Amino acid sequence: MIIIGHPWISSPKFCKVFSAADIKKSKAEDIVLLEPLVDSHTLASHCRQNQISFAVTVNTLQEAIFANALGATYMVCEEDDALIIQPIAQEYLFDTRVLTLIHEEKEITKIARSGIDGVIFPEAIC
């Protein structure tokens, strides 16, 4: 299970960007976070063409399918959406990992039992 943003575990920062200029300002070790996909698909293509790791927030299965097709490293979603997306991601062998946004450590076990790829704490998002 992937755990991002917990103080015990070293993990990259996910930095929100809204333009190609923001992407250029980001650190090489950061994961570029695009949101929402409908407004950032050109930035996703830019990241893919330039081999920049990126994540995208998704709210629907359709957005998740597009995020994977665009080459996102991660997709970030709420638990309810993750429960719908994860089985499809496994069935179609998505390269993109599904992360659920959580606020408390005790939620990790519940997400793990649901078979979701991982969790991300808000502290990991800048």
Task: Show which residues each predicted segment covers.
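Active-site-adjacent beta->alpha loops and helix N-cap segments on the catalytic face
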Residues: 34-47, 77-94, 106, 126
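Conserved N-terminal beta1-alpha1 strand-loop-helix module at the mouth
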Residues: 1-69
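Catalytic cores of alpha/beta
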Residues: 61-70, 103-117, 121
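Glycine-rich beta-to-alpha transition loops that act as phosphate-gripper elements at the mouths
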Residues: 36-37, 54-61, 79, 98-107
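Glycine-enriched alpha-helix->loop->beta-strand junction motifs that scaffold or abut catalytic
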Residues: 48-53, 70-75, 95, 113-119
